From Swiss-Prot, chains A, B, C, D:
This reaction introduces a second double bond into the aromatic ring system. It comes from the Archaea. Reduced FMN (FMNH(2)). GO terms for biological process: amino acid biosynthetic process; aromatic amino acid family biosynthetic process; chorismate biosynthetic process. Belongs to the chorismate synthase family. The gene is aroC. This is Chorismate synthase. Its cofactor is FMNH2. It comes from Sulfolobus acidocaldarius (strain ATCC 33909 / DSM 639 / JCM 8929 / NBRC 15157 / NCIMB 11770).
Length: 391, 391, 391, 391
């Protein structure tokens, strides 16, 4: 049954396998009039791109092509399709995988579900994290539209393996973690993370981590009770990322250890005269609705399943127990690149709900709106460019 | 925009407010031929019912009425509607709430979204946990259908405030937590939980907790990549429960602290000759698909927001800061009753995906299937009855 | 699989069988702040009510109860549920039907699909036209919301059996067919229709007919290419009415006999300075989008299947050919009451698309909007009341 | 808001504009294991291809590429994507259109909805019938899957302008209309149609027509009451085709002129001992469900809007009335190629409902099923090949 679409008013449908000719995404529901260019999408993809230090060695240029929905540089209201060709594909690295499902991977469940004879094992096929590039590509459009409500999203790697950020961090620092090749929001943290990564690489092992995403200026009242609450849709979107095994927002699991008098927040009049909450303990969501405070959520990534260390598995040809050393080209910690994917998923959910709640016009932008979005986007890109180069 | 429906092939739509004439649910997608009675639904509701020791004092009989979709004791394929009248309603307890939004509650976000003038504040209106009775009612049908695949769901309160179960626990013990008024799976734990509850009641405070849900005999391959993965739909469903602020499955957040060589599981040949995983570290879901191992997931409940202790809020009449002591009748730990709601949500997601994957016939049950389900259900009820009475 | 919901932003889910305790509808997606009363719904239902001259003798009071989603006379944003109890039920009239499926009815297909043992034959069960009362009830809310765009819908019986209106008719005349017990838009036509009906009643037979629906002031640009075009969603909605076997808009089937130079319309500057079409040959829809001209569509109703004349069928007990004379209480021409149902379906589709295109705020109405709607609605009711009484 | 997807279990999402780099379709919900090749898709496309006698002069090779979802010649369960590059594009023919919206076309409504500045006027942009090639491509997969239930679909041009088939026609003759370049099911009809077309071409005019689609061996019980009835979903699908302005099934509009005793069918025991209907007056659908008889439906195509004859329009630069002679390369009767598109839409709806009703396994085909489908498909292609060549 279909499962490759997400969103009700801003709806993405992704397609493509790791070692097929291309991956891509159809974005349906983009209002007409938005300026959008290949460069806008490339820009967002640049923060996810493999082939950098500390991540997988696969050298994909990730060059997006917009093949529908845009005319003369602006969206037309028709479905917007982006394709990204797969260039740097070495399927031969996966020959062993064909017979020996990799522990921690989707290999065996896919075989169980779809049949061994129908399994595209090359590079993980459809279950490969390569698919997430489509999501990040689509998120460029989401982020541009969110300029209309001044919503900006920052994300960083809050913990990597045993190392966790345990001091205060500003939205600015989180946002600027784009500067860091390991998405650390503090310099000292970056060093510690890099050390862990190097050590794991040497050992042929990997680390898990926690990505934290913050969104500023989230429109008030996003979320539709009782099942399409903002927290529900965010949880679904984040759990749809490969390797994500947990989600929490606000106090999250810590709240389960607390008393009501600790976990409840105080309702106050803010300096701007508006009602709000003193400490934002709820992470910006109360009653399932955005409440005007910063959105704060985290998701747990398990360690990269592909490791060089030998692991026990079964040889499907002989049905005998065997071992495998996964050789492909893999991230020592998927959580690092996962940060930008988590950020993308939050953008996709927020823009969907901003449309659902009427904050963004569903059919077309006015000329003013289109222009303002473009100006804000230019400033955003300018601001982020040094970060892009630093990585 | 609509948000009150969940599921694609087994689709529930709930309605009703805490202090309206009734709450209810339409279940669309139930195959014809299933035996279903008011008693079946009442049975499941009995484990959630307020008015017991350690939970809210509201005395609702929770008497469900099936008003459509069943003829001569069997489903007809038409939408099945269950209504539950609200009887024990004391709206006067909420007069103060009308002007003083309760910290930690949906009050203020609902006002922000829908307008103060349209806010049904009585008993929390639509945001009340009362709505979850509709879900539990619907879950009786889900659980009966899941008898076809021998899928059984157990759930317990894994931690309450600072007290956490830190020893091995069997599926049987978890299942039998229905015996416990605080949903503890061990006797010593029950005592500790009860103590905490009593103390909180005295203090006019509340506690958070973690519910763990285990499902045995989950059909293999449930979940639809890449967005309707089983983990995604479970996360969405569980986060849609009021007061749930976190979700994890398998190793969950702990995996984020681990190395790949620790977090990966071993693929082995089981005693029955089938492929499987040695330790079920993945909690029954790999690649987003159920893998034949037990489903293991947890969700974090924040402490009950309604506490008698005075809390800071704002009086909407004067726009001045004020305090409120929430007096209604509330659970000292929503997590306790939350256990049965979490269990219900898991049942609803599993049956939806079992239908999506073809494990349950979409249109009608054969006579054999209907009879087998009924027999298994009778055994299940007999088994659980002593638990019901012990509470 | 679920099939009892319609609409994406204004979503109705109906439930209930002809001889069950009640029928009803959940309307999800109604913005908060709309004034709505039981009387508003009763008013719309009055034009569909059976128990009048020329239609079925079943005496249903059709008294709607709003059981959720409204507080203090205004919608809250929560799902709005309306129930209508079934009172005048005589199931004994259906004893013969149990074994002899009625020609032209859903009896045998329902038995084939859901199983004989699960078939609620009483009054046609779920397939009864009784279900359409839920749709008309929901359409009251749709029509009120459409007051915001001044959209008004008129409908009449364009033909009954061999008699067809073949002269010009104004929107006003069509709208005022509510005065007529047979939904005729001209006095001479009314007489002819009544004669036909009387004759059919005497013969124990029935007639088919064509309902025409016109909507004035339809917002421009409704419809979402390429599958949710306005014409597509209208066709689906109208074909979902029992006994409807055909749909056309604008020139409809006549266009298939024409040349392009005849069927094309002229694009002109209207007196108000706006672009438009000279003759509205397209019936208000071009490219699948509403184009600002009046919406004009028709649907064909087959004759009432329930007739007293003996018809050939098979006795399911003996598997031998047999005959049946259907005795229940039935309309001699379902098309008559079908007019109000067709009108309701058009309202439901238009309001859904008006929401999708941003003409109606998705979350809540402003105080001004709520007031203006109410004023216009009052005028509409006042205008229609004499029509109600005349029937 | 998204509108480019159709179907619940077999879900197509199309993208692409007439003069963009490519058009295409994602098919989500295809079970794994189906053999599928580029040739299969090309085969179906061949019956729709422009560039033949009597249809548009645009010479598109319509060469489909499968870029995802297939591995080693079989579907994998991942979304299957087909792209078709646009090669023979002459946008210069549309320069006049840019300022003079064409009567009968989507031009002006698209401008009204999405804004003049966002309008891709080249070749009709998204509203071009070119998009229907994506649907026909997807229908190849649908038709293959329907081999499992032996469902075969035939379609022919029942009338063209004033000429209508008024004698009996067999399913075989209808099916073999693929032989005819004008989709006529009788030789004498073919000649009359060709004459009409030639005359229209000379005059610079066009004709409307009616396509009739018949499906044999439709599984029993397809359709989900009360809104996703088979007739409703068919109506929606057919009305989504550009230029379709009417739909009917069975007796259709003729039933509206009849008495119940004429329109009702007789329920009988068929020669095979099964229950059925004597005359199939209902066209295979009763109560909204397929009833085991042949599906019979028709849709009305208006005449091609693009004609060389001068027509009145408005010049958008001057806002003055003007005339246009549409020069591009167009079919003299869209209904001719419309036959294959109507056939495709019926296949798409039937396969969706066959999956919804459990006739086709939702996740994967067994080896036997895959093989049987392939064998039947080969026979079907062999049978149709001479027809392909004759055109």
């Amino acid at each position: 049954m279909p499962g490759n679409s997400l969103g009700k008013m801003f709806r993405i449908t992704t397609f493509g396998e790791s070692h097929g000719p291309m991956i891509g995404v159809i974005v349906d529901g983009v209002p007409a009039g938005l300026y959008i260019s290949k460069e806008d999408i490339e820009f967002e993809l640049s923060f996810r791109r493999p082939g950098k230090q500390f991540v997988s060695g696969r050298r994909e240029k990730d060059e997006p092509e917009i093949v529908s929905g845009v005319y003369n540089g602006r969206t037309t209201g028709a479905p917007l399709t982006i394709i990204i060709r797969n260039n740097d594909v070495i399927s031969s690295l996966y020959e062993e995988v064909k017979h020996k499902p990799r522990p921690g991977h989707a290999d065996l469940p896919y075989i169980m579900k779809y049949g061994y004879e129908n399994w595209d094992y090359r590079g993980g096929g459809r279950s490969s994290a390569r698919e997430t590039a489509s999501r990040v590509a689509a998120s460029a459009i989401a982020k541009k539209l969110l300029m209309l409500t001044d919503t900006v999203i920052g994300a960083h790697l809050k913990s990597l393996g045993p190392v966790e950020l345990d001091e205060d961090v500003s939205f600015r620092e989180i946002f600027c973690s784009k500067y860091s090749p390991v998405r650390a929001s503090k310099k000292w943290l970056e060093e510690k993370y890099e050390e862990l990564i190097k050590q794991a690489t040497v050992e042929g092992d990997s680390w898990g981590g926690v990505a934290e995403v913050i969104a500023d200026n989230v429109p008030i009242g996003l979320g539709e009770p009782v099942f399409d609450k903002l927290k529900s849709d965010l949880a679904k979107a984040l759990l749809s990322i490969p390797a994500v095994v947990g989600f929490e927002y606000g106090l999250g699991f810590k709240a389960s250890k607390m008393k009501g008098s600790e976990a409840n927040d105080e309702i106050v009049i803010k300096d701007n005269g508006k009602l709000g909450w003193r400490y934002n303990k709820a992470g910006g969501i109360l009653g399932g609705l955005s409440n005007g405070e910063k959105l704060v959520l985290r998701c747990a990534f398990k360690p990269t399943s592909s490791i060089r260390k030998p692991q026990k598995t079964v040889d499907l040809r002989t049905s005998e127990e065997s071992t495998i050393r996964v050789i492909g080209r893999h991230d020592p910690a998927v959580a690092i690149r996962g940060v930008s994917v988590a950020e993308a998923m939050v953008a996709l959910v927020l823009v969907d709900h901003a449309l659902r709640s009427g904050y963004i016009p569903p059919v077309k932008l006015s000329e003013d709106q289109a222009r303002i979005i473009e100006e804000k986007w230019r400033r955003y890109v300018e601001e982020c460019k040094p970060m892009q180069e630093s990585q």
